[in-house]
């Protein structure tokens, strides 16, 4: 029997977190192998943040085309925005993603990380000192590897409901496979993915319905964000079906979808060209053999890890979406690098770990959302209502002074204690993601309301409102 290739560090999952951790480990001289089942870059690069933002840009540009005449360009017909070349743009977007896949591959090569494509299974064999990983490629070939340390960063996948005809809908991955633009589309789910996709479709002139279980979208965010985005989506003409749930889907002979849903105790029907499920995500761990290997998962199936990313089995680690803790690409990258620093780096990194508090996040809705820290409700529960002071501002950004349409801008600072430490910052409006990045530094450094007040405002900007609120 041929000897089994052995590594210092074996990473299962070639997404952002896995690649970052593998590259960092290799930079310290660790012999490193990375295993990826599909395409390098994971969800973010292939079917997430990157192509989503490209589509958001197109939708945002369509909105600006519709506004151009009011900004002094009389020859720009607003109807130009309705003539979006979906299939042509998809090809261009896919080519961009493929270039990024190549960049990821070259970066691994540059750091000396070996990599193979295939699906990994943890494997125990009598007499083996180190755990084995069995890898099966799509062409059926199999190979065994062993490693001193293994890290699982396989990510997540869209969750699908158990309703009749669910297979006639597509998930958020399927959104990026659409070759033509559906003219009548429904998005099921009021979380950030559903809100983003509904905004893209609406901006590109698809007749858009958004099924929402509650009375507001984005229920994981501060109530100001929930109300502002929900109200504006309704105002803009998105068919937001509050308190609704899809019961079944029937595909007609002509390809149309007849969707039956329940709302306010009554069953109703709607005919669509496409339906997209965005009801949540779950860990991608189907082939891993976690149970037999003794790796504990929680009730939702996510791998349980401690503050140092250690699983319940010695020398097996995990991070990213498969752990279900702050499922954001930059968080997985940061956690992956810190794990490799601790495992393979100099002694000053021996206790390094990722802090999962005060993580800035954005929703690329229309308009954008930015949030860091805790909500107003959470602050009052944590600190006591009498110890929390909230500053809010709702206004129309200067950009809209020339326009009949008035998109909302809403800002909130949640402050706690006598020194009014800013424990939550929540914003809705143009460029919220870009604005939040800088303010995220301030929140992480423990800024107080007085610190905000002592900053000279940049005028005229929307962001100046955050340092002038009283």
Swiss-Prot record:
Q: Which cofactor does it need?
A: FAD
Which PROSITE patterns is this protein grouped with?
Answer: PYRIDINE_REDOX_1
Q: List the disulfide bonds.
A: 44-49
- The active site lies at 459 (proton acceptor)
List the catalytic activities from the record. Answer: 2 glutathione + NADP(+) = glutathione disulfide + NADPH + H(+)
Q: Which residues are noted in the entry as FAD-binding?
A: 16-17, 36, 43-44, 52, 120, 321, 329, 459
Q: Which GO-annotated molecular functions does the record name?
A: flavin adenine dinucleotide binding; glutathione-disulfide reductase (NADPH) activity; NADP binding
Q: What is its EC number?
A: 1.8.1.7
Other notes: The active site is a redox-active disulfide bond.
Question: What protein does this entry describe?
Answer: Glutathione reductase
Q: Which organism is it from?
A: Yarrowia lipolytica (strain CLIB 122 / E 150)
